Amino acid sequence: MTASLKAIDGSAELATLMHDLGRRARAAARVLALASPEQKNRALEAMERAIRAGADKILAANAEDVADANASGANSAFLDRLTLTPARVEAMAEGIAVVRGIPDPVGAVTESWQRPNGMTIERVRVPLGVVAVIYESRPNVTADAGVLCLKSGNAVILRGGSESFRSGRAIHDCLVQGLREAGLPEAAITLVPTRDRAAVGLLLGGLNGSVDVIVPRGGKSLVARVESEARVPVFAHLEGVNHVYIDRSADLDMAKSIVLNAKMRRTGVCGAAETLLIDRAAADTHLAPLVAMLIDAGCEVRGDAIVQHADARVKPATDQDWDTEYLDAVIAAKVVDDVDDAIVHIHDHGSHHTDAIVAEDAQTAAKFLGEVDSAIVLHNASTQFADGGEFGFGAEIGIATGKFHARGPVGAEQLTTFKYRIHGTGQTRP
């Protein structure tokens, strides 16, 4: 079912619409759970073609969304997340191709063992069922979530942000075309066809048992609302208050390259670094060059007293800066006593998303990787690798920062659960 914008007359009509979407998605999930890998891949291949063929329509729809956002005074970071370019549309199509090429997780036997009574027990991957994805300004999430749920045998209900509705609708049309060509139900990938914010509340209620899990993808307030109000399980994608720690053993050239990429490659993504921590023993040699490099690249640096002393252009940091996801060309910077002090700071101010250490000393790096309690920890690499595509997942539905079921980039495999399959030869329990 392609999504056309619907005018809703009152809460009762909206509830009827949403519950109907839920029932259709539940029926589609039963079909997808039994679909062969070949049929799902045919749909993905058709979606890839449709995205490329429909690029002009997608970009035109996105231009309207961006124009509205500009007129409403959206900041540069928001506009970057909202904007599609020919390269980003092509990357969307390439991501679908990668997802098509990964092994189908459904039906995979992850463990198998035989009991003394002769029974064989297998642990087998199965779809979750119906996934609801609630997201804000990123139109590419429409494609990422749709194709990952399809690959993993799940139906999905997509509720994108009102600011990206036209873009999401154009992308969704391409996904539905792929489902059609492969003979799969169109309700397998459903886009909520209204901007009415009350639709979110209905999704959080689970649509009378139609929704099995909710994935929020957006700012702190959205995720907090979902976690507070959801009556079904949630894969929480929290904000990325990400750190790069520069150890006393760090190579300066490597540190400069990693810090610049981690902060400035794309400032509006959840994997961007937001705080720079520098070992006090490295401050004399590393601090000033790193700060100057960032400022010269157009990044505002907010630092403690030592960082301010290193460069007159540094602005004073407040307590709030250590807890802020800027999603902009701003970074907080602080000198810490050592790796232990860095770990304490990350524990107190981080969001359990992504944190990196730059160090040549293997023992220090191992300590950091072992003790920092984040979904992704990196040694001598940029935090911007916090991305499902970079993990080889093809795409991601989000970065889960909780500890249950899925953690880190949520790809097709993470969108499955399991059942136990037992083979006997007539055994009965004594």
Swiss-Prot record:
**Oxidoreductase listed as a keyword:** yes
| One Pfam family in the UniProt entry | Aldedh
Cellular compartment(s): Cytoplasm
Question: Which PROSITE patterns does the UniProt record give?
Answer: PROA
What EC number(s) are associated with this protein in UniProt?
A: 1.2.1.41
Q: Which GO terms describe its cellular component?
A: cytoplasm
| Top-level class of the enzyme under EC nomenclature | oxidoreductase
Keywords associated with the record: Amino-acid biosynthesis, Cytoplasm, NADP, Oxidoreductase, Proline biosynthesis
Quote the catalytic activity from the record. Answer: L-glutamate 5-semialdehyde + phosphate + NADP(+) = L-glutamyl 5-phosphate + NADPH + H(+)
Q: Which InterPro entries match?
A: Ald_DH/histidinol_DH, Ald_DH_C, Ald_DH_N, Aldehyde_DH_dom, G-glutamylP_reductase_CS, Glu-5-SA_DH, GPR_dom
As one GO molecular function, the record gives:
glutamate-5-semialdehyde dehydrogenase activity
User: According to the lineage, what is the superkingdom?
Assistant: Bacteria
Its pathway?
Amino-acid biosynthesis; L-proline biosynthesis; L-glutamate 5-semialdehyde from L-glutamate: step 2/2
Q: Coiled coil: which residue ranges?
A: none
Give GO BP annotations, semicolon-separated. Answer: L-proline biosynthetic process
Please tell me where this protein is predominantly located: cytoplasm
The role this protein plays is: Catalyzes the NADPH-dependent reduction of L-glutamate 5-phosphate into L-glutamate 5-semialdehyde and phosphate. The product spontaneously undergoes cyclization to form 1-pyrroline-5-carboxylate.
Q: Which family does it belong to?
A: Belongs to the gamma-glutamyl phosphate reductase family.
Q: What is this protein called?
A: Gamma-glutamyl phosphate reductase
Naturally occurring in which organism (per UniProt): Rhodopseudomonas palustris (strain HaA2)
